[in-house]
Amino acid sequence: MAANGRASVRPVERHGAPPRPAGRSRSVAPPSRRPSPSPSRARPAAADNDGGSDSCRVRVAVRLRPKNSEDLAHGADFDSCVELQPECKKLKLKKNNWSCESYRFDEVFSENASQKRVYEVVAKPVVESVLEGYNGTVMAYGQTGTGKTYTVGRLGNDDPSEGGIMVRALEHILSVMSLETDSVAISFLQLYLESVQDLLAPEKTNIPIVEDPKTGEVSLPGAAKVEIRDLEHVFQLLQIGEMNRHAANTKMNTESSRSHAILIIHIQRSSRIEDGSNTSLPNGTDNLFPDNLPLVLKSKLLIVDLAGSERIDKSGSEGHMIEEAKFINLSLTSLGKCINALAENSPHIPTRDSKLTRILRDSFGGTARTSLIVTIGPSSRHFSETSSTIMFGQRAMKIVNTIRIKEEVDYESLYKKVEHEVDHLTSEMERQQKLKNSEKMQLEKKLKESEASLNDLKVTSNMQIENMAMEKRQLESTIKRLMLDLEKEKGKNNILSEQIIHLETSLDENKQKQLENISNTNILADTTKSHEKKIRELLKQLEDERSRSASMNDHLNVLQQQLSDAQNYFQKNIACELEKQLSRTTEEFASQISSLEERIADLISEKELVYEELKSTQEKMQQEMRHRQGLEDEILRLKQSLADNCSEESKALCGMVRSGSGLGSVPFMSKSGKSRELLSSQRSNISKIFEEVGLPNVLALLKSDELEVQIHAVKVVANLAAEDVNQEKIVEEGGLDALLSLLETSENTTIHRVTAGAIANLAMNGSNQGLIMNKGGARLLANIASKTNDPQTLRMVAGALANLCGNEKLHVMLKQDGGIKALLGMFRTGHNEVIAQIARGMANFAKCESRVISQGHRKGRSLLIEEGVLNWMVANSSAFSASTRRHIELAFCHLAQNEDNARDIILTGGIKELLRISRESSRDDTRNLAKKALNSNPAFFKEIQ
């Protein structure tokens, strides 16, 4: 928006030292604020339990806007009220050429500081903290036209180097995070006319602000929450928001924001509790979760561009713009009150006074890391606005936040995960049961098939056995037949053997006969060969029959052994193996079913424990919230009681201030007409407040930045000062200094009136009179008298000065500090009660002065005459009420006792007044004093003659 005429800062990059804690150079470091309780959790800690926390002070930087066209138009006549010392992190605020004050901040940016350096010093530490899981806030505050929107909301479309904190923060976050596992979403809102509106969805207006009763976290449930895709998407969303934001043209800024802009960046990052970490879980739940417990880091970053405070006479706002300015100033005032209360460690922080303070509740005094950049202009024409902005930053530096990481177990997702696992295991168990039943049926089927096969095998075996037996019988019969054949062959062989023997014998005989019958040789040889061949064939056939018989015997033995083995195998081994396999399968399924049932029981137990833990945690949080609400109600009741008591006591303030200097104890301000019983009751209430609250706490309220608190506190002090027993305590505790400081700094008429009354009561004591004068009390009272025309305030001031006039040691100082002139000057009001106090003061002064002169401690004309009081007395001695006339007559008579005053009395016509007093005065002592003066002074006697 700065590109459209908003105030801007020239980007010149400079590198400074890292920021350090700072405060005003003439004061000590800001006091630490005690951390407030918060439902969030810090590392290291359990998923849902609060752990340790870190205290972090609000970091404040100041940025000076360059001269704008209006400043440059003055040329050499331009008067700057700001002098920067960036290297010392200081700035000097010049009220005039001889008076200036120095302030220290965490960082001071000159008009040449670049946008990049401002981001790295102010916002980058907060963004990095948000990425670690902490909440964070970056906020710009300052007068309209000093460059807040340029610093925070500049998009930098034409020149990326001019990009503001919003763009740079989102660019930083997107460069670090992984959008696959993490998520980034933004909401862009504006607070316009005390109504929260959505800049990304303009139709959404008057969005409610909701506070979580358990954690106290503030949320805006009706606001649009847009998931970020990339940097280009970011620019589109920010441009849409800027176009929908309200702005107007004023004398101080051509594009003045008319609403507070709030960019909320929601970050969610996944995390896990690793083995061996210091993370602890609730008692009794250590074994319920896996080793790596899924966690979620949730954090949010608020970047706030506040609308500038403005004065109608300077901005030139008209019509509806006046209404806008009123709401802007009201919300900024509420924010200032909260900052003041936090800086002063007030027990009550008025965050509910406006929607802005409700939204920023966590940013100041809460659990967020906060950086504030205040922007100022150089022109002395806006000195008061610049001073107010600087003091706002100084007070913010005193605030200490307790930052916490919001790291928690997502019990809902964990419950869903466990429930899903239970369902999965249940279905798995059912599937396994079905599978078991199916396999059991299959095994039973296989068993039946095996039994059938076994039966078939038995039948087959029996048949084979029968066949083998039949074959055996056949073989046996064959063997028997072969044996018979063999026997026959043996018989034949025996016969043949016998024949061979016979033939051999015959051969021998034939050999013998061969010689005898050569002719028969061939026949014999052929017959021999034929017989030999036949013998060989018979021998071979015999061997074959023997071999066949042995083979048949072996085959028969093998078949018998196979039959026996088959019977044993099928009857024992196969059946036993099937039974073992069936038993083993049954045991495995039973074991699996038992394991699944135990796992399901454990998961159900885990589910019940998680539910009970959640329920117990909710009950504890509800009890804590009820206890906290009770304490807050009790505090509000006590504060209301204190305010009511203070209000009642303030009504009796004027009636409790007494006169002094030996003129009696008649109250010089009392015209209330209240009864003694009411006064006694009021004093009893004051004593009760004094005992319950304590004087130091009451005096501390005098320094409060809230006007109503100051008024009530000074009324209580004034009433306490009306009692002699309390005056010494008030002075010892610094009450006199606080009252004088309040009289000097405050511009409120009520505070002036009551403070002057309190000082008048303290001035009843002689020792207090000297302290009041030495601390410049008379000068301050005279200053108030010259600035106000309020009769009641002037009555209080005149009463205080009248009491001081009763101390002769202070007369010279009273004259030098303008006290006598102030008394005489208050006659201009014409108010009878004011004039009565003036006359009482003159009487006190003249009486004490006369006593000192008569004792020889002083000579010369009266100081009253030197200030022109005599002429006033002569002219007005008979113009007022009886009591006022008595005081004037008494003062006149005491002045007449000093012979050095005779000439002035004669010249002013005072002889006639003395003669009148000596005859007509209502008091005998006054008439006697007048006669004494006339008779004892030769000059008077001569004048009478």
Curated annotation (Swiss-Prot):
Gene3D superfamilies the UniProt entry points to: Kinesin motor domain (3.40.850.10), Leucine-rich Repeat Variant (1.25.10.10)
Keyword vocabulary terms for this entry: ATP-binding, Coiled coil, Cytoplasm, Cytoskeleton, Microtubule, Motor protein, Nucleotide-binding, Repeat
Protein species of origin: Oryza sativa subsp. japonica
Comp. bias intervals (Low complexity): 22-31
Coiled coil (UniProt feature): 415-644
Name under which the protein is recorded: Kinesin-like protein KIN-UA
Signal peptide: none
SUPFAM superfamilies: ARM repeat, P-loop containing nucleoside triphosphate hydrolases
Residues covered by region (Disordered): 1-54
InterPro entries: ARM-like, ARM-type_fold, Armadillo, KIF11-like, Kinesin_motor_CS, Kinesin_motor_dom, Kinesin_motor_dom_sf, P-loop_NTPase
Binding-site list for ATP: G142, Q143, T144, G145, T146, G147, K148, T149
Residue intervals of the Kinesin motor domain: 57-399
GO process annotations (BP): cytoskeleton-dependent intracellular transport; microtubule-based movement
UniProt motif (D-BOX) ranges: 369-377
Domain of life, source organism: Eukaryota
Assigned protein family: Belongs to the TRAFAC class myosin-kinesin ATPase superfamily. Kinesin family. Ungrouped subfamily.
